[in-house]
Each structure stands twice: as C-alpha cells, then as structure tokens.
Amino acid sequence: MPTPSMEDYIEQIYLLIDEKGYARVSDIAEALSVHPSSVTKMVQKLDKDEYLIYEKYRGLVLTSKGKKIGERLVYRHELLEQFMRIIGVDESKIYNDVEGIEHHLSWEAIDRIGDLVQYFEQDEVRVETLRGVQKANEEKSN
C-alpha cells in the first residue's frame, strides 16, 4: 500500500498523463512544488514498487497497478471536493481541506461519503434543506 506521499505522486502523475499524455520529472516537480531531485527519488521508489516504469532521460509510464491506484486517488480527491461543496465549504478553502484529510480516511469512509454525495445529488431539495439548517445555525450563533 502506498504511503500518503507516494499517493500524492501517483495522483499527480496520473493527472499529468491524462492531461498531456506524459509526465516528466520537471512537470511533476512543478505541480507538487518540490525539487526535481525529490521527484527522481520518489519515481525510483515507485518504479521499485511497480507503480510505474522509469527510464532515466526517457520518462515514465504507469503500470496497470499504478493506473488503477491513480484512478482511485483522483476519484477520492474529486469526491471529497464534491462533498465539501455540498456541505457548503467556501470554494477557496476546498482544495486545502481535501489535501488535509484525503490520506486520513479509510476507503470505507470514502465509499460512505460517496453514498452521501449521491443521496444529496439525487434530490436538490435535500441540499436546500441542508442550507436551511446551516442558515438557522448561523443565526443562532450570531
């Protein structure tokens, strides 16, 4: 099982390959705001653990194992962003909040959050009811 740091790299590599068709060390470093040497070390570790295949100066490709995990990590991130929007978290805070919690939730918790997101999305009245509860709570606290 990948560590949270490994997950961040796999997720970013998956997104870059999906967007550009490839992922270079420099692109990964820029996206994660880390030094290229840190990326090289992690990519070598991910290669050793068979999440990707890395050839120096030639680039990297995700293995089927890496693609599967990358897809699941992107799903988790997007789902948590959806959840944050539904519960009314300010848009400017969503990314950092998701980054702060995504590695600490079990996949069972993610699946249950997915159920909850689906529940709210099936009927807009449910979201409106939640907004009413939130408004009432805000008025009580003021």
UniProtKB/Swiss-Prot annotation:
Q: Which UniProt keywords apply?
A: Activator, Cytoplasm, DNA-binding, Manganese, Metal-binding, Repressor, Transcription, Transcription regulation
Q: Where does Mn(2+) 2 bind?
A: 11, 77, 99, 102
- How, per the record, is this protein's activity regulated? DNA binding is strongly activated by Mn(2+).
Q: Where in the cell is it found?
A: Cytoplasm
Q: Name one GO biological process term.
A: intracellular manganese ion homeostasis
User: What are the GO MF terms of this UniProt record?
Assistant: DNA binding; DNA-binding transcription factor activity; manganese ion binding; protein dimerization activity
Amino-acid positions noted as binding Mn(2+) 1 in the UniProt annotation, renumbered to this chain: 8, 99, 102-103
For this protein, the record's InterPro entries field holds:
DtxR_MntR_Metal-Reg (IPR050536), Fe_dep_repressor (IPR001367), Fe_dep_repressor_sf (IPR036421), HTH_DTXR (IPR022687), HTH_tscrpt_reg_MntR (IPR022897), Iron_dep_repressor (IPR022689), WH-like_DNA-bd_sf (IPR036388), WH_DNA-bd_sf (IPR036390)
Q: Describe its function.
A: Central regulator of manganese homeostasis.
Q: Which PANTHER family match?
A: IRON (METAL) DEPENDENT REPRESSOR, DTXR FAMILY, TRANSCRIPTIONAL REGULATOR MNTR
Entry similarity comment: Belongs to the DtxR/MntR family.
Name of protein? HTH-type transcriptional regulator MntR
Specify the species: Bacillus anthracis
**What's the name of its gene?**
mntR
